[in-house]
Amino acid sequence: GAAIVRLDAFAYAPKAPGKKNFLNDPETWEFLQQIHELAAPLGLTLLPEIHAAYEEKIYKTLADKGYATYDFFLPGLVIDAIENRRADYLAKWAREVVDDKISTVNMLGCHDGIPLLDLKGLLPEDDIRSLIDLIVSRGGMVKNLHGQKNIYYQVNATYYSALGESDSKMLLARAIQMFMPGKPQVWYLDLFAGKNDHEAVRRAGESGHKE
């Protein structure tokens, strides 16, 4: 059976009139504790999936409460390191993970694309914008659901295409992930160097998923 249960988009679970309904406090954490009490006797590990900007420090709150956090910072940091030939921001994050004993599950590509909103507070905003422009220039797409101010949520692209469909860059990115602190996850499409499929997007239309 399952050993780890992912709680997808968990921060949106508790709802209340007049609240922002994203990570409502204390309701979100109380609900998570209730699930934990059900899961613990079964030996299940919970993995709350929460997208939030680095500057909000929600990953630290998860760590303080004894949960692992999805490392949604790593995908953008690795692209930044490879394309801009610098490792300072990536190294800063790696040091923080080690020094603060933050338990992470990391990834590069995924079915939602490449998360970039999460980098706010870790990368300068101009650099985030440049990453978006680079990935879009390589065939990535941005679905703007909430207006210009939130345009850089996730860029819909495979990781291989985001790296310019370069075998050497993809291998380097995967090596960095494997040696990064945390438990690595590999999206099945990345195993086969999957490329952006614009024809599939066209066929799916507005109601289709993003990948």
Kindly label every feature range from the protein language model:
Residues 1-211:
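Active-site and adjacent substrate-binding regions of carbohydrate-active enzymes
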